[in-house]
Amino acid sequence: GGPGLEHLEFDELASAIRSEKPQYIDLSGIAKGYGVDAVARYLDSEGVGAYLVEVGGEVRTNGRKPDGTAWRLAIEQPIEQGRAVNSVVALDAQAMATSGDYRNYYESNGQRYSHTIDPETGKPIGHRLASVTVIAEDCMTADALATGFNVMGFDKAMGLATRENIPA
């Protein structure tokens, strides 16, 4: 069989994961979001009431800017060259994460391949969904959902987002 959680054995008491055969586990789909949340937790513990934390494009906010206005963030238009704003959102005690392959891909023999791997096939995703942005209460959740939605493709992702009332 191919990749998948069914090939792993989780031992919570030992904080261990075992596998009968070599497996590659990539946590990059939540790593930046986790880092943002860790910094936000620290700022909360220090009594900082208003902040914007950003790591590699993943963001979490709390409170308002010093001038009293909401934190406003641009969502980029997914274009390979240059930068352009697609839309602007105001966040208050929320997180936002984006996943996409419009800049992070590789080419081989004239074929373009996404850096995102489909867990069902073990191969790069094959659809042309360029970018997904998700807003959630915490950044690790937003990061994981954005990556998952990117893997799913537009129709499945929007169906799930609509059913679960997830801003995407």
Show where each model-derived region lies.
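Mature catalytic core of soluble alpha/beta enzymes
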Residues: 1-168
